[in-house]
Amino acid sequence: MEVFEVDRTEVSIGVRLMRETLIDLERYIVSEGLHRYRIKPSQVATMIVKDWINKPILDKSKLIYGRINNEPKISRLTVKLLEEENIRLYEIYVKEYIRECSSVNVLIYNIILQFLENKGTLSILNEFK
């Protein structure tokens, strides 16, 4: 019996962040000891989004709809999701957040922002400890 490996296509999504948010991501990496494993902000952002897809809850009163004047998003990172995860993220966006966020990229920004504000914990951290 032959076993065929399924081609798992990755989708890259570029997200613009405020510099302070990127710094908070880097602080999170250091506080959780992930810097010892050379984990980068993009990888942590990807983990945050993947965890959120499994439990998609955000405080809608704190959501940012789009770009705010006088608040440049100067940092950029890439979130990499499997095609199925990307489809699921888009389904959640259309069903729950399309009126609160101008795009999926802005939804991802809100996911990261609320994770950091709430001092969330990643499910994958158990593997590193």
What residue spans do the PLM features occupy?
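Short Lys/Arg-rich basic patches
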Residues: 1-22, 29-30, 58-94
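Extended, hydrophobic interaction surfaces within ordered domains
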Residues: 11-53
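Active-site oxyanion-binding pockets that recognize sulfate/phosphate
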Residues: 8, 35, 98
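Short, basic amphipathic alpha-helical segments that act as recognition/interaction helices
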Residues: 36-63, 100-129
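Short intrinsically disordered coil segments
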Residues: 30-32, 94-96, 125, 129
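Intrinsically disordered, low-complexity N-terminal regions enriched in serine/proline/glycine
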Residues: 27, 36, 89-92, 96, ...
